[in-house]
Curated annotation (Swiss-Prot):
The keyword Mitochondrion appears for this protein: no
Pfam families: Ribosomal_S20p
Gene behind this protein: rpsT
Sequence segments annotated as region (Disordered): 1-26, 73-92
Family recorded in the similarity comment: Belongs to the bacterial ribosomal protein bS20 family.
Domain of life: Bacteria
BP terms from Gene Ontology: translation
Keywords assigned by UniProt, alphabetized: Ribonucleoprotein, Ribosomal protein, RNA-binding, rRNA-binding
Compositionally skewed regions (Basic and acidic residues) per UniProt: 1-21
Polar residues: bias regions: 82-92
Protein name per UniProt: Small ribosomal subunit protein bS20
Function in brief: Binds directly to 16S ribosomal RNA.
Length: 92
């Protein structure tokens, strides 16, 4: 337990930041999983492109705000772009 008033405040701030960081990373994980799910489900190209756009926007935002490292955001965007460019829905 913190002994000083300022240490108590820092503990509260750290808890809030931790929760915020966890929520943002969880959102990112969901967006990335959504795109992968659409690719695996052989969805229409337009649906995959919409998911790609949402994922890139989320990666850009989190990279700029330093929730994730900017290089990681760039690497993930490159991987998503490659997956989108290689994606061709097969008729079933």
């Amino acid at each position: 337990m913190p002994l000083h008033k300022s240490a108590e405040k820092r503990l509260r701030q750290a808890a809030r930041r931790n929760e915020r960081n966890r929520a943002r990373k969880k959102e990112l994980k969901g967006v990335l999983k959504n795109m992968q799910k659409l690719i695996d489900a052989n969805a229409a190209k337009s649906e995959v492109e919409a998911a790609y756009k949402a994922a890139v926007q989320k990666l850009d935002r989190l990279g700029v705000k330093r929730y994730i490292h900017p290089n990681k955001a760039s690497r993930k965007k490159a991987q998503l772009t490659k997956a989108l460019n290689n994606y061709t829905p097969t008729a079933s």
